[in-house]
Design a protein with these regions (language model features):
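Residue-level signal for transmembrane alpha-helical positions in Major Facilitator Superfamily
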Residues: 14, 18, 30, 67, ...
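N-terminal transmembrane alpha-helices
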Residues: 4-42, 55-70, 74, 99-106, ...
Length: 443
């Protein structure tokens, strides 16, 4: 456990963020390896089928992850206030609420999958392959949820190392499972999806056993599973649904944009898939410091240490801006090589469009870096509405661009989408946080 209410914020934030960074990097490394394995052994059609549905699976998975991170903010506040009974109860309630959400999403996702894929304009020749892949991912949502709850709770009490170790084991098993099921057993994209779910299941078991043995304060009892604390339930639903919907709104906009991308042909789908995979690595530190600040602000708010919160937000923003500069240099020097590394494709249209995406979007990363830090800090401080408004603006912006710029300009319209919406999103966030009592209050 790590208490973020004591010690130098500059050091605490970095040491807390490092394991999260390595965990996210491992996850993205698996994603890239999965893409390369599918592209190399199953071909462009299979890669395009997975790429055309990635946004849909991300929409569902990111909602659950966001919701669990929202629940964990309440856990972090309980830990900061040194209220261990409420901390344990928050874990029990997180499991119950999360499982209910996962079951509903699983049933709804499987029932309406075909209409959704057709709405996304998934090409007819890719539809069966795409359905196989996404069906397994959706069927495994309960497993995904359990891991997210356990990992988020561990981070809430300052333990970012254990989720990293568990994830490392999961990633190795996942890549090994891909090679076994795809290359040896010839299960196609179905094998890739099955390997993902099975590796997550092993991660859940390992994480649960470790948590039970290591942290006596988190050994939940039957009473902790009862949704009987009205105040806690309201706070958890408010925080969890806010962060879940915040992630979903972002992904709904991206999903709508994907419907336009799917009309631009197989090479553009592959190019965009590659560009997004690489940009996820480029933007990894935004998510890392965002998660860090949600926990950091939650613990320090619970302890009533306001000045530490302000200083932490400024430090995290500075760290991410340094990372932005490194991203720009990378995109302009080896961007095309990275595209080839991810896809294995030498098609000029794929290389050119994916590289163009990276070169343009990285120039505006400073804006989205501030967005991620401020938005997650506000969630940690209990502000739910404005981050949702900001995410809603992103969703609306992407929908409008999908309907206007993409039909007019093709893929360059897609490339312009995110920089445009980032500038729109940042306005309400800055207006709100600069007015918040926690920012103005003097200590």
């Amino acid at each position: 456990m790590k208490d973020l209410t004591k010690g130098r914020p500059s050091v605490l934030i970095l040491t807390f963020a490092l394991p999260i960074f390595l965990a996210n990097l491992l996850q993205l490394t698996y994603s890239l390896a999965d893409t390369r394995i599918v592209g190399t052994f199953l071909g462009d059609n299979a890669l395009a089928a997975v790429g055309a549905t990635t946004t849909l699976s991300n929409l569902i998975v990111q909602f659950l992850m966001g919701m669990c991170n929202g629940f964990a903010i309440i856990s972090a506040q309980c830990f900061g206030a040194k209220d261990m009974d409420r901390l344990r109860r928050s874990l029990g309630n997180s499991l119950v609420l999360g499982l209910l959400a996962a079951v509903v999403l699983t049933i709804g996702g499987l029932v309406f999958l075909q209409p959704i894929l057709r709405f996304l304009n998934v090409p007819e020749n890719l539809l069966n392959t795409a359905t196989q892949y996404v069906s397994v991912i959706i069927a495994g949502l309960v497993v995904t949820l359990l891991y997210d709850v356990l990992a988020a709770t561990l981070r809430a009490i300052g333990d970012t190392v254990t989720p990293l170790i568990v994830l490392a084991v999961s990633v190795v098993l996942n890549i090994g499972g891909d090679l076994l099921l795809i290359v040896v057993l010839h299960m196609g994209v179905l094998g890739a999806a099955v390997a993902t779910v099975l590796s997550q299941l092993i991660a859940v078991v390992v994480c649960a056993v470790y948590l039970w043995k290591k942290y006596e304060i988190l050994r939940i009892r039957v009473d902790d599973l009862k949704l009987q604390d009205g105040g806690m339930l309201r706070n958890m639903l408010s925080s969890g649904l806010s962060m879940g919907f915040m992630s979903s709104l972002v992904n709904i906009g991206t999903l709508t944009l994907q419907t336009s991308i799917n009309k631009l042909g197989q090479n553009i789908i592959i190019a965009h898939t590659a560009a997004r995979k690489i940009s996820e690595i480029f933007m990894i530190m935004f998510s890392v410091f965002g998660q860090t600040m949600a926990t950091y602000c939650g613990q320090n708010l619970g302890a009533g240490k306001i000045e530490r919160i302000r200083r932490g937000i400024l430090l995290a923003t500075g760290y991410t801006c340094i990372w932005c500069t490194l991203n720009i240099v990378t995109a302009y020097t080896i961007g095309d090589w990275l595209v080839w590394l991810v896809t294995g494709s030498k098609t000029p249209e794929v290389i050119y469009n994916a590289t163009l995406y990276l070169k343009v979007d990285t120039l505006f990363y400073y804006v989205t870096a501030v967005i991620c830090i401020v938005r997650n800090s506000m969630q940690g401080l209990g502000e739910r509405i404005v981050p949702l408004i900001s995410s809603s603006l992103e969703m609306i912006g992407k929908i409008v661009i999908a309907a206007t710029l993409v039909p007019m300009f093709g893929y360059p319209g897609v490339i312009a989408a995110e920089p445009i919406v980032w500038f729109i999103m940042i306005i309400p966030l800055l207006m709100k946080i600069l007015r918040m009592p926690v920012w103005k209050q003097k200590t």
